[in-house]
Amino acid sequence: VEIVSVTMDTPRHRCTWRDVFRRTRQLANALTAAGVKPGDRVASLAWNDYRHLELYYAVSCMGAVMHTVNPRLFPEQLEYIINHAADRVLFIDPTLLPLLQVLQGKIPCVERIVVMTSDEAMPDAVKGKLPSYESFIAGHSDEFDWPTFDERQASSLCYTSGTTGHPKGVLYSHRSNVLHAYAGCMGDAVGVSARDVILAVVPMFHANAWGLPYNAAMTGTKLVLPGPKMGDAETLVDLMNTEGVTMAAGVPTVWTLLLNYMAQTGKQAPTLKKTLVGGSAVPLSMIKTFEEKHGVTVLQGWGMTETSPLGTVGTLRPDMMSLPAEQRYQMHAKQGHGIFGIEMKIVD
């Protein structure tokens, strides 16, 4: 089963879950050699690709805490959260290196910076000054003795913008990530299975990409990661068609761009069966367009960074399936029902 990634150094990189597991152990050894210990925070400023996926697993499984940083935040916010988290190592995508110039001298907690590319593709501005990801893991064993620790130990760290003041840090435990992965694979939730091919457009720096990297590993699902092209409709449609994508996940603005592109070009995505949409309310017109013109079911989800993050999903009950189309669309426009593990209370 493949993980397909768009990166700056490889337009269409392919690897298997076996490869990811092997390189994850190499990365864990490299981090250990760099002095990273259980409980330490390791940050990423990166898009969705296979190297970021390896970071997800290496950092958390060695007992450290994976801190995915949103590169779209204001520089002052980036400075604050990196220092607040006390990140010791920072992995950065080469396309985001200009952020380093803004942060230079302002993040003293960071002891090491690694550029997420190969030596051959290193930008001239940092060549010889910073290590590439590939040189960082090169030469390290692909065997690693994973430690045993309490399931409630911190696994990953995301910052939520909140409503006032600075962004707030939310720690995910290993337990919450595993339970969320189980819940997401249930048929009446997202229904991720080994028969799917998932296009994760939702960023890996946004609430753990809604848990999809864990769902995919749990089920052995083919995962398609669009890298820095996550907002490019032409690339997304091409990935859907060449990789046989059956399910995609992202915010409404992405799907607006995609639907407009498909309408203008006449292109289709015949293998796509459903989209998981969250982040903001889904317009009823989008639900109708997806279903009537493309045969795609829209699953609207609601959640928060604090809920790991999925809280509800809009799958239909059996008695709703026979409703007229307009009424079904109205149901899909709602936030749906709570998923396993979520306690909810409706307050008037």
For the regions a protein language model found, what residue spans apply to each?
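Conserved AMP-binding/adenylation subdomain of ANL enzymes
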Residues: 178-197, 207-246, 261
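Structural core segment of the AMP-binding/adenylate-forming
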Residues: 33-34, 61-135, 149, 251
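Conserved AMP-binding
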Residues: 46-49, 70, 192, 201-206, ...
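Conserved AMP-binding/adenylate-forming core of the ANL superfamily
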Residues: 2-49, 53-57, 74-79, 129-135
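A short helix-loop-beta submotif of the ANL/AMP-binding
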Residues: 41, 47-67, 71-75, 83-89, ...
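Conserved adenylate-forming
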Residues: 31-36, 140-152, 157-199, 211-212, ...
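Hydrophobic alpha-helical segments in the ANL/AMP-binding
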Residues: 32, 50-69, 78-79, 185-188, ...
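Gly/Ser/Thr-rich phosphate-binding loop
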Residues: 218, 245-250, 259-330, 343-345
